[in-house]
Amino acid sequence: LDADCALLEQCGADYVFAPSVEEMYPTKDNRHFEFPPVTTVMEGAHRPGHFNGVCQVVSRLFYIVRPDRAYFGEKDWQQIAVVKALVRYLGLKLQIVECDTIREADGLAKSSRNTLLSADERAIAPKIYSALKAGKEYGATHTLKETHDKVVADINAVDGLEVEYFSIVDGNTLQEVQSWDDSQYIAGCITVYCGKTPIRLIDHITFKE
């Protein structure tokens, strides 16, 4: 928290809201949120209940702070879709602003999880985005399935990396597409296990927009 506050101060923030657990959850939160299909695919399928927890804490935050705008990074592509669905469901007058993924010089998407990587793991982690970029170029002259399989194979060929899932989806609905002609807005969302622990890293790339 201290490190985050220092960064926020450099950015000119006037206030930081850092509530205790008791402030956020004065009573047990029994609300259940589900917005198929965006909460049931990809992360929703591999981590059941994850987005319900996200919606619980984000909705509490919105109710307490009452913001006009909320900013979310595109690295977690699915989370943005879930939060937008939550805002529509709750009828909040709130603009969700999508922020470009910020990357290290070697292409690794910035994330708090990166601090958990060992030196060896940190050295191979950028190969995830390298494979995604190569896949985008490859996809210009190959089928969607061929592109999908190449990205997965390229990452799995790296010792210490293992793809949990790689989904090529409609950028709005998050439903998997079978052909490049299925949508005008196509994104690839990936989760990769890195290292022996392992650390779970997510990333994405836009194929068509």
State each model region's role.
Residues 150-209:
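Phosphate/ribose-recognition catalytic cores of enzymes acting on nucleotide-derived substrates
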Residues 1-161, 169, 173, 205:
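Nucleotidyltransferase catalytic core that binds NTPs
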